[in-house]
Amino acid sequence: EWYMGGHSLGGAMAAEYVSKHVDEFDGLYLFAAYSTADLSDSDLRVFSVYGSEDGVLDMDKYRKYRSNLPEDTYEYVIDGGCHSYFGSYGLQKGDGTPDVAFEEQIEMTVDFITYNSK
């Protein structure tokens, strides 16, 4: 099985790429991201993950573009998680205050990917 994934703008670009190569992938992981490409009629397994304290992800756009994903897209909200903790670059300007440690959010994310990619 092949999955594509990305964080923030990288997630949007991953979704765009997958939309043009949909037959080559089994699924897509979006981390604090949304897809402007229409994948709604695809058979992809799509997982959307973001933190409850994310201050960077534009939730209005996230909701607006939700219809571009398959109906059975699974959404996982990391309680206390933030935008910056999907990467290793420090806290991003405008992000919320996380209620979990960086290592904890990374571990939850890895566990989620591992469990759902079986």
Tell what function each PLM region has.
Residues G5-A14:
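Gly/Ala-rich beta-loop-alpha elbow adjacent to hydrolase catalytic centers
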Residues S40-V46, L69-T73:
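Short, proline-enriched alpha-helix->beta-strand connector loops that line the catalytic pocket
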Residues D23-S35, R45:
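A conserved short beta-strand
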Residues L57-N68:
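Short alpha-helix in the alpha/beta-hydrolase fold that links the catalytic acid
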Residues S48-Y50:
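Short beta-strand/loop motif that positions the catalytic acidic residue
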Residues E1-Y3:
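Gly/Ser-rich "nucleophile elbow"/oxyanion-hole loop immediately N-terminal to the catalytic nucleophile
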Residues E53-L57, H83-S84:
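Acidic catalytic loop of the alpha/beta-hydrolase fold
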Residues T73-K118:
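C-terminal catalytic histidine-bearing segment of alpha/beta-hydrolase fold enzymes
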